[in-house]
């Protein structure tokens, strides 16, 4: 009976082990990447605190979200900044924790969640840039 119990226990462990072995690893930013992002987000937050849409646009990949109608700082201010960077959302980004993840295209991204929106910052050849605002679903 003892032998049978051990076999059943071993079989159960063999069946459960792959679930633990295949658990997805959480991406972690390298210290150098984290340092680079910390420098960027500090400047971005300072621009938000000053309500400086031109400075924010300077740290944004344009055309914004590949929308040809948002190609420069003036268009960004009118179509994105006024709507998405309210005082409440600016305050949220200033105090919100940025979460790192690497996407399917191997891009390094940080996300700041503010209520129903996600603000996305992506590492580009030019350094980090604000690249997207989307719905937090």
Give residue ranges: language-model regions.
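Bacterial N-terminal signal peptides that target proteins for export
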Residues: 1-8
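C-terminal-biased regions
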Residues: 23-49, 53, 57-137
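Hydrophobic h-region of N-terminal signal peptides that target proteins for export
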Residues: 12-20
């Amino acid at each position: 009976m003892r032998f049978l119990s051990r076999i059943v226990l071993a079989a159960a462990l063999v069946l459960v082990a792959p679930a633990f072995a295949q658990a997805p690893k959480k991406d972690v930013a390298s210290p150098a990447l984290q340092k680079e992002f910390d420098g960027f987000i500090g400047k971005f937050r300072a621009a938000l605190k000053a309500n400086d849409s031109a400075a924010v646009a300077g740290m944004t990949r344009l055309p914004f979200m590949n929308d040809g109608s948002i190609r420069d700082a003036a268009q960004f201010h009118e179509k994105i900044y006024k709507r998405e960077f309210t005082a409440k959302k600016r305050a949220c980004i200033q105090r919100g924790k940025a979460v790192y993840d690497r996407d399917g295209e191997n891009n390094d991204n940080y996300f700041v969640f503010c209520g129903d929106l996600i603000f996305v910052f992506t590492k580009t050849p030019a350094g980090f840039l604000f690249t997207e605002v989307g719905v937090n679903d």
